[in-house]
Swiss-Prot record:
Protein name: ATP synthase subunit delta, chloroplastic
Function of the protein: F(1)F(0) ATP synthase produces ATP from ADP in the presence of a proton or sodium gradient. F-type ATPases consist of two structural domains, F(1) containing the extramembraneous catalytic core and F(0) containing the membrane proton channel, linked together by a central stalk and a peripheral stalk. During catalysis, ATP synthesis in the catalytic domain of F(1) is coupled via a rotary mechanism of the central stalk subunits to proton translocation. This protein is part of the stalk that links CF(0) to CF(1). It either transmits conformational changes from CF(0) to CF(1) or is implicated in proton conduction.
Keywords: ATP synthesis, CF(1), Chloroplast, Hydrogen ion transport, Ion transport, Membrane, Plastid, Thylakoid, Transport
Pfam families in UniProt: OSCP
Membrane topology annotation: Peripheral membrane protein
Family annotation (NCBIfam families): ATP_synt_delta
GO terms for MF: proton-transporting ATP synthase activity, rotational mechanism
Length: 177
């Protein structure tokens, strides 16, 4: 088993347990996703946090200034612990593991949908309702992607399942072509 995975899983499980006992799971899940998004949009900030030449104290102070009262105490302390233990480099993996644990605990199924054009809210809601029936999940989280090469229709992926409703797929599998 990959070492990053093991480390990330341990920290994610620990954070999940603490957040669960404090009834802060939804808030912390949202905050972790927001922080991950900020770090992805500002890679210089991430590189600053993982740089071993910068002191832990400077990193901690920077975290406190940047997120100044915008984070739950649990999330803030978690970030500070990651910095202190030199585990901030695993932050993305930890968030990914936390999301997996969250999805399992809330019976959420993540579904990737590729389409030629953007789906309307009504179309998304229709798909969510149908996918709940198919997957027996309480919640469906859609990851939407535009793929003009499909010509028309959709490709739906969840778990190890793939449903190809695209015109490209139908043409590819047609015995007449």
């Amino acid at each position: 088993m990959h070492n990053n995975y093991k480390i990330a899983k341990v920290y994610a499980e620990g954070l999940f347990e603490i957040a669960n006992t404090k009834n802060s799971l939804a808030e912390i899940n949202e905050q972790l996703n927001s922080i991950k998004s900020v770090l992805k949009q500002m890679p210089e900030f991430y590189y600053f946090l993982v740089n071993p030449l910068i002191s832990q104290q400077i990193k901690k102070n920077t975290i406190k200034i940047v997120f100044n009262n915008n984070l739950d105490k649990i999330t803030l302390n978690f970030l500070l612990i990651l910095i202190e233990r030199r585990r901030i480099i695993y932050f993305y993996d930890i968030v990914d593991q936390f999301i997996l644990i969250w999805n399992k605990a809330t019976n959420t199924s993540v579904v990737e949908i590729a389409s030629v054009i953007s789906l309307t809210e009504k179309q998304q809601q229709y798909l969510i309702n149908k996918l709940k029936e198919i997957t027996k999940a309480n919640y469906i989280k859609l990851k939407l992607k535009i793929d003009p090469s499909l010509i028309g229709g959709l490709i739906i992926k969840f778990g190890s399942n793939l449903i190809d409703l695209s015109l490209k797929g139908k043409l590819k599998n047609s015995p007449y072509i």
